[in-house]
């Protein structure tokens, strides 16, 4: 067994480090009134509660649970994705629509209502600054899109002007699964 020679300097350093631990732990705690974001568990749903038939597939965008549910046309594939959701109920259009167009590397253009609030906003070409991320699936409602995002902090939060945003890798997956004509319900 080795003989450990501890000096007074080692002893003081050890005690000092121990005294710092509680302060660093307190720095990591959340205030009691904070709310959770990016919830990691979702309840599964049944497509029959929303649609009379699967058609080319079905999507439910749930603004309360902040999740997107996808069912394939044959009903064998069911997936749940965390999403960003509209900031307010006024920005949330609810009801039935469908995917009418899809685009890899979409460009973003501010809507007329956004330009009223932010007249300096300019269109953004595809790339890392684009708020639509890497893929976009346009709905039959003007200016409503299921898309990706480069800002992953938005997922699980109320952060959009009406769209539903997914992590870029998840929108790429959904983009491959959901063809044009996929039914969409926003609740």
Model-derived features with residue positions:
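N-terminal secretory signal peptides and thylakoid transit peptides that target proteins
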Residues: 1-18
């Amino acid at each position: 067994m080795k003989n450990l020679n501890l000096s007074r300097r080692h002893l003081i350093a050890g005690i000092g480090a121990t005294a710092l631990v509680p302060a660093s732990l307190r720095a990591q705690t959340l205030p009691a009134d904070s709310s959770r974001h990016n919830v990691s568990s979702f309840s599964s749903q049944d497509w029959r509660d929303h649609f009379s038939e699967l058609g080319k597939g079905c999507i439910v965008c749930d603004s309360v649970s902040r999740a997107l549910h996808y069912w394939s046309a044959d009903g064998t594939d069911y997936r749940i994705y965390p999403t960003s959701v509209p900031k307010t109920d006024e920005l949330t259009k609810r009801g039935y629509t469908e995917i009418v167009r899809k685009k890899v590397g979409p460009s973003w253009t501010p809507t007329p209502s956004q330009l009223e609030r932010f007249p300096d906003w300019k269109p953004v070409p595809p790339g890392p600054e684009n708020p639509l991320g890497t893929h976009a699936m346009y709905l039959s409602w003007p200016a409503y899109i299921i898309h990706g995002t480069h800002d992953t902090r938005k997922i699980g939060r109320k952060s959009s002007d009406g769209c539903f945003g997914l992590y870029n890798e998840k929108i790429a997956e959904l983009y491959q699964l959901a063809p044009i004509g996929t039914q969409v319900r926003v609740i």
